[in-house]
């Protein structure tokens, strides 16, 4: 059917209201305000900046550990300490080695684990606060709207079409059907987070990939409330070892928050060999370690969530400018994979994008030639300084932790070069080995007090979708799922998804993939880790998804 869409025009359209997108909007609004106050021409307006947020509230889809380096926030909001919801400054940084029964604190905390001067934060709270500043600056911020489709103009982009609302699960209009808007803009900023669906399309269409494919990890997090005295606010610990195999890359975190709350989780690189490895089970198992068990004893689970993150670093960063478009934040691989710090880099990338757009608006030139200044600004900023030092870091661990420590140690004393520069990488899903008829493991149930099954955790994520809408997890060939994938890999989607979205259900004598899309926490692991790369995550109806309040 042909859909008539309302068309709106903006100077700047930002897709995604995370730290990168909101920093871009706020910094650009401030630049415009100073420009207009000076009497310079042309006169510009912050009201012509549009920001789309697919969540039902600003911050609802924001999840991180999180420890934040405040450098970018201090640039953006110099008096941030007066009003920003920063939970607590870091007071103690520990690096712990776990064996199954014991733990050992490294006497001198390695520099990557030293967080002096940083803050433990709730990213959701911080982003919600930033959203208020953006709206106060006159920017138009639209909640419950996702970018469903790019509007192309030659090799560039000219805006996006938002998702249609009110379609039933068969794609037929319901009584409340509302077509998506056609939003056209002089510059469109993709700030969708890791594995953004529009960014993925643009990178593929315009061949914007770098020399390495992007590498990804999945972070699984729980927020707990524990009895008083169990942990000091500002205590942060990172764990290495059990239960993560030395052949894999990953580790845990424990962060002390105010009001007897604890942020804890496990991060695993999505490039392991066993297709039936289960990151959620690994996290639940990690919690049974005596150190963690003792911390959580007498406490209760408050919130749960999961998110993918870009590990690839400098050599996996896509070209981040095209005619009429820029890529910022996690969509553009702005993450220090050694320190697992990305909030300040995302914010800085958004600010540099704002400065580039501001100059383009003044010149009324939105070509790639003009927007290329964004990349040049990055190269002359502390983003390049930080990421260049760790440009080969994650690739060092492709053959396991011991090999990784050897290479990363050499990189530490050679400014990031090491023995091989650039060190190449392979896409994570290519690491899977075949199952060769091995039986499936028993499914994890949890004890309901310390450890939990997926559905219990999903309940604590606040996830909500209208079940009568088209499935937003598009599998291009279901026959592969019921045949080749069963035999070759044992359907890894049942294991890598932290939200029980995918299951193989029996229908007579055959297996068929069942997709429980309403459980989806928007981590996009399926889009990343599927061995055949036939799953496409697209935006569901706006307002759906998790509610990461306080996370």
Residue ranges of each PLM-predicted region?
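N-terminal Rossmann-like FAD-binding beta1-loop-alpha1 element of flavoenzymes
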Residues: 10-50
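N-terminal FAD cofactor-binding segment of flavoenzymes
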Residues: 27, 31, 45-100
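Active-site-proximal substrate-binding core of FAD-dependent oxidoreductases
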Residues: 42-46, 333-339, 351, 355-401, ...
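Predominantly flavin-linked oxidoreductase catalytic cores and closely associated redox partners
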Residues: 43-45, 133-294, 333, 352, ...
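Glycine-rich phosphate/pyrophosphate-binding beta-alpha loops
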Residues: 120, 331-344
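FAD-binding beta-loop-beta segment adjacent to the flavin cofactor pocket
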Residues: 307-337, 457-470, 481-496, 503
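C-terminal helical "tail/cap" subdomain of flavin- and related membrane-associated enzymes
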Residues: 358-452, 464
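Iron-sulfur cluster-binding cysteine motifs and their immediate structural context
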Residues: 487-514, 525-547
């Amino acid at each position: 059917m042909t859909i008539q869409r309302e068309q709106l025009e903006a100077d700047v359209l930002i897709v995604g209201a995370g730290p990168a997108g909101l920093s871009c909007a706020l910094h650009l609004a401030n630049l415009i305000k100073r420009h207009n106050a000076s009497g310079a021409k042309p006169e510009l307006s912050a009201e012509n900046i549009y920001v789309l947020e697919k969540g039902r509230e600003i911050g609802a889809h924001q999840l991180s550990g999180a420890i934040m380096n405040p450098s970018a926030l201090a640039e953006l909001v110099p008096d941030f300490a007066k009003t920003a919801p920063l939970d607590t400054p870091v007071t103690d940084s520990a690096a712990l080695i776990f064996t199954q029964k014991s733990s050992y604190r490294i006497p001198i905390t390695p520099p990557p684990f030293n967080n002096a001067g940083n803050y433990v934060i709730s990213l959701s709270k911080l982003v919600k606060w930033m959203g208020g500043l953006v709206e106060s600056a006159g920017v138009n911020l639209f909640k419950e709207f996702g970018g469903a489709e790019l509007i192309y103009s030659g090799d560039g982009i000219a805006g996006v079409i938002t998702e249609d609302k009110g379609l039933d699960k068969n794609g037929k209009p319901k009584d409340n059907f509302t077509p998506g808007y056609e939003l056209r803009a002089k510059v469109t900023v993709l700030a969708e987070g890791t594995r953004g669906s529009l960014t993925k399309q643009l990178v593929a269409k315009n061949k914007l990939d770098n020399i390495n494919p992007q590498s990804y990890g999945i972070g699984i997090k729980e927020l707990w409330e524990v009895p008083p005295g169990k942990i000091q606010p500002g205590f942060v610990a990172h764990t290495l070892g059990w239960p993560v195999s030395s052949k894999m890359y990953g580790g845990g975190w424990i962060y002390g928050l105010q009001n007897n709350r604890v942020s804890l989780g496990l991060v695993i690189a999505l490039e392991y060999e066993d297709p039936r490895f289960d990151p959620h089970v690994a996290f639940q198992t990690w919690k049974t370690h005596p150190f963690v068990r003792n911390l959580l004893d007498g406490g209760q689970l408050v919130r749960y969530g999961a998110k993918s993150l870009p590990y690839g670093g400098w050599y996996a960063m896509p070209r981040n400018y095209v005619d009429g478009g820029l890529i910022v934040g996690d969509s553009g691989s702005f993450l220090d994979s050694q320190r697992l710090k990305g909030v300040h880099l995302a914010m800085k990338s958004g600010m540099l994008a704002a400065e580039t757009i501001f100059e383009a608006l003044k010149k009324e030139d939105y070509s790639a030639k003009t927007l290329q200044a964004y990349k040049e600004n990055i190269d002359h900023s502390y983003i390049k300084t930080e990421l260049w030092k760790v440009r080969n870091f994650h690739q060092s661990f492709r053959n396991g932790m011991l090999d990784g420590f050897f290479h990363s140690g050499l990189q530490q004393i050679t400014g990031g070069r090491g023995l091989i520069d650039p060190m190449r990488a392979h896409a994570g899903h290519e690491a899977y080995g075949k199952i060769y008829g091995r039986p499936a493991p028993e499914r994890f149930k949890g004890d309901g007090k310390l450890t939990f099954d997926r559905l219990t955790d999903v309940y604590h994520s606040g996830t909500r979708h209208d079940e009568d809408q088209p499935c937003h997890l598009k599998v291009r060939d279901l026959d592969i799922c019921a045949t080749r994938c069963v035999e070759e890999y044992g359907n890894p989607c049942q294991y890598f998804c932290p939200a029980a979205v995918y299951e193989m259900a029996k229908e007579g004598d055959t297996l068929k993939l069942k997709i429980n899309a309403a459980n989806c926490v928007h981590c996009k692991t399926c889009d990343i880790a599927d061995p055949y790369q036939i799953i496409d995550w697209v935006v569901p109806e706006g307002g759906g998804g998790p509610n990461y309040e306080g996370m």
